[in-house]
């Protein structure tokens, strides 16, 4: 994530979830953003301003009339400088103030003066959140252009269980990144991505699978989301959901095949990063297979060739990207697969190369199309995903010029 040159104003209000916000401030500052933190006085009861000052290297402002802080009309200069405001956690009280234009502290004053994108993450007791007054106030904020980040559900600090939890740090950071990090050059595109390994059952207890974690597919989904695409992620992974992305679960190759047919054929791009089984048990035992002396033989049968089917039925607008996991003859085998299955691009990687393959956060790949072969050095899967998105965008642009 690269937010260099961006100014972000974080508004922290008086809820217990304020303790989570140092992680968000640190992540944004680490990404290069100039982070300024505004706190309500009640917020300082939960966490001290010094924490944010240490993490951001900027003065944390609480009092609108702080005479020890030299700033050119602070609320105006901060409002003008901000590329984005994130108010999290946002209490029912502050949400009500903002919805009705009240500006009685530095946070609400800067928010009222700012013209940048504004994100609000409600965090409160379930009954307070579901109160019609709070819901009307949130709708009012949306009417005025605020983006309301949906609350999570679970055990709350008050002991109740329900909605009202502040979303995880990564979700808040993704909302910021979607607004600021990239040109929205995939706006209007529908992209379908598959991720994770298939699980082919042998009996009610066991199944055949592989080492795929889904990290590469999730990185591609996130990259396309950040660039403005409408993304559907077909997944067997238990990784956290990607914000703004439609999640469609699958387990077996047959379920993935049906999900591809249902979601991908009217898309602009299909990126098949899932590790799909080539074989499955021909018969699934109705009861657990018991251990006994001697060998156990399981008859296998071929699964459907999903990419092969897509290649045969591919509509003109659909860009198809597959993955090739090899241990030798990487380029030759991957290029042959590209042509055989009528793909537009194949991402080839050798699982024997250190830092590549399953379960790690990095990859070493070669992007192969009909006209070029680009070898990428060891880098994060997020960076690889951006390179894949680059090829999708460039291919679409070339087609539009014809």
Q: What residue ranges belong to the model's regions?
A:
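A cross-family phosphate/adenosyl-ligand binding-site feature
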Residues: 1-119, 125-402
């Amino acid at each position: 994530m690269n937010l260099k040159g961006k100014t972000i104003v974080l508004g922290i209000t008086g809820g217990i979830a304020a303790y989570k916000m140092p992680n968000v401030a640190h992540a944004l500052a680490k990404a290069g953003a100039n982070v300024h933190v505004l706190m309500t006085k009640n917020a300082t009861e939960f966490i001290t301003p010094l924490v944010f000052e240490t993490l951001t290297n900027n003065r944390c402002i609480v009092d609108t009339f702080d005479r020890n802080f030299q700033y050119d009309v602070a609320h105006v200069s901060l409002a003008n400088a901000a590329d984005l405001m994130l108010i999290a956690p946002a209490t029912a009280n502050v949400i009500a103030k903002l919805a009705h234009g009240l500006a009685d502290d530095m946070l609400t004053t800067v928010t009222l003066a700012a013209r940048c994108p504004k994100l609000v993450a409600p965090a409160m007791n379930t009954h307070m959140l579901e109160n019609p007054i709070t819901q009307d106030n949130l709708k009012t904020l949306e009417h005025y252009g605020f983006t309301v980040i949906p609350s999570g559900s679970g055990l709350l600090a008050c002991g109740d269980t329900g909605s009202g939890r502040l979303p995880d740090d990564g979700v808040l950071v993704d909302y910021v990144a979607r607004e600021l990090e990239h040109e929205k050059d995939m706006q209007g595109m529908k992209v379908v991505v598959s991720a994770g390994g298939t699980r082919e059952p042998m009996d009610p207890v066991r199944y055949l699978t592989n080492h795929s974690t889904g990290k590469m597919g999730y990185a591609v989904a996130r990259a396309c989301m950040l660039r403005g695409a409408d993304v559907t992620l077909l997944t067997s992974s238990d990784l956290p959901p990607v914000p703004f992305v439609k999640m469609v679960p699958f387990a077996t190759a047959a379920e993935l095949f049906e999900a591809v047919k249902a979601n991908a054929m009217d898309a602009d791009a299909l990126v098949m990063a899932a590790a799909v089984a080539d074989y499955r048990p021909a018969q699934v035992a109705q009861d657990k297979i018991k251990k006994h002396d001697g060998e156990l033989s399981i008859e296998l049968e071929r699964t459907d060739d999903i990419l092969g089917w897509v290649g045969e039925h591919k509509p003109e607008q659909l860009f198809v990207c597959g993955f090739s996991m090899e241990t030798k003859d990487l380029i030759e085998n991957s290029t042959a697969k590209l042509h055989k299955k009528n793909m537009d691009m194949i991402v080839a990687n050798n699982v024997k190369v250190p830092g590549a393959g399953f379960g790690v956060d990095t990859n070493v790949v070669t992007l192969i199309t009909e006209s070029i072969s680009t070898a990428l050095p060891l880098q994060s899967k997020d960076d690889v995903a951006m390179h894949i998105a680059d090829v999708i965008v460039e291919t679409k642009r070339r087609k539009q010029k014809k």
